[in-house]
């Protein structure tokens, strides 16, 4: 058998570990041929590929980013929307001309949706979910999330000392456009006093009261963790807006910090390396067993899979009955 691997969408710690997990399992255990497709689905359209062997897959386990490159282009979706039916056929043609028996698509929600569309066309496809946002429906955790939470938590830990020294409010903005998983997990792990996520509406007056109540109790500084996707006035970044509103409400000097792309870069944590390796290996096992049109998932501590058509278009969001939200509120943490 011959399989192709591509990575699409934003970069994420653990992609290379996944490529390694798929490739080494395929080559060393199943005797398959493996090629890497450059720059996501664009590389499939252009037949921009490389052949993998055991040696070329060595030394990449701990590397951030993706050795295959990536892009956010979704040519398949755009072409279908514009009615250019010849281009989807070009994808099929190139798949066949490359001699592929299966395509492994490593990516987030958009990538898995595209993978599902390719599967519906009759191509053999396996999806492997990746995003630091942890918002892909059907899997408990996506690789990259643990690394991002570790980076954000370390930043929050460091900001505690400057906040306490200057008796300030520090507002830390982390990634999470539609889902607040990073803010929730890093905010709880980092001892945040206020955690704001897109899923839970907030009241700036209540936030101000929380901070002033801390001041009355002899706690002259506060840590506020916000997801980038919370509602603002539409003109400012989340952290900037919340910092200005808090300072206006409380009169306490407030500063903001935006972590940005640092959360996506660098070496994956041991947890993410192991999760990526397991997911990659399971993807190859499905291929060997002829089980296509599925996305790899983590359920509890077990690697499993789900049909791609059940995944497409669905987001996994934080709910108010999430155990971390419930426990945080019990300890006096303000969620808005």
Regions found by a protein language model. Give the residues of each.
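N-terminal phosphate-binding or glycine-rich loops at protein starts, especially the Walker A/P-loop
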Residues: 1-48
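Accessory alpha-helical/coil subdomains and C-terminal extensions
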Residues: 94, 105-107, 115-117, 144-252
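Short, acidic/small-residue loops that bind anionic groups at enzyme active sites
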Residues: 31, 38, 119-142, 196-203, ...
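Flexible, glycine/charged-enriched surface loops at secondary-structure junctions
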Residues: 31-37, 162-169, 220-223, 251-259, ...
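Short Gly/Thr/Asp-enriched flexible loops that form oxyanion-binding sites at enzyme active sites
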Residues: 18-22, 109-123, 183
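Glycine-rich oxoanion-binding loops at beta->alpha junctions
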Residues: 46-103, 143-150, 154, 336
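C-terminal non-catalytic interaction/assembly regions of soluble proteins
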Residues: 238, 242-336
């Amino acid at each position: 058998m011959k399989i192709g691997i591509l990575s699409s969408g934003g970069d994420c710690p653990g992609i290379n570990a996944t490529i390694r997990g798929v490739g080494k399992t395929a080559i060393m255990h199943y005797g398959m041929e493996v090629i890497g497709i450059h720059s996501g689905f664009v590389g499939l359209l252009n037949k921009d590929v490389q052949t993998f062997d055991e040696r070329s897959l060595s030394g990449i386990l701990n590397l951030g980013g993706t050795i295959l490159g990536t892009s956010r282009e979704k040519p398949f979706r755009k072409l279908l929307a514009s009615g250019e039916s010849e281009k989807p056929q070009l994808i099929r043609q190139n798949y066949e001309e490359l001699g592929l028996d299966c395509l492994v698509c490593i990516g987030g929600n958009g990538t898995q949706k595209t993978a599902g569309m390719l599967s519906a066309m009759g191509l053999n496809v396996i999806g492997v979910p990746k995003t630091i946002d942890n918002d892909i429906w059907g899997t408990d955790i996506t690789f990259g999330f643990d690394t991002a939470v570790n980076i954000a938590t370390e930043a929050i830990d460091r900001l505690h000392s400057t906040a306490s020294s200057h008796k300030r409010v520090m507002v830390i903005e982390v990634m999470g456009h539609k889902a607040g998983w990073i803010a929730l997990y890093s905010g709880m792990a980092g001892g945040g006093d206020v955690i704001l996520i897109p899923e839970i509406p907030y009241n700036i007056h209540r936030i101000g009261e929380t901070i002033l109540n801390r001041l009355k109790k002899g706690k002259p500084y506060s840590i506020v963790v916000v997801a980038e996707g919370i509602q603002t006035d539409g003109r400012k970044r989340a952290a900037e807006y919340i910092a200005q509103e808090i300072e206006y409400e409380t009169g306490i000097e407030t500063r903001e910090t935006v972590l940005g792309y640092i959360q996506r870069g660098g070496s994956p944590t041991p947890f993410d390396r192991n999760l990526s390796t397991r997911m990659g290996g399971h993807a190859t096992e499905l291929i060997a067993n002829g089980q296509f049109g599925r996305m790899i998932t983590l359920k509890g501590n077990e690697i499993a899979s789900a049909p791609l058509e059940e995944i497409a278009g669905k987001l996994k969001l934080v709910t108010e009955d999430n155990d971390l939200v419930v426990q945080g509120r019990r300890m006096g943490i303000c969620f808005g």
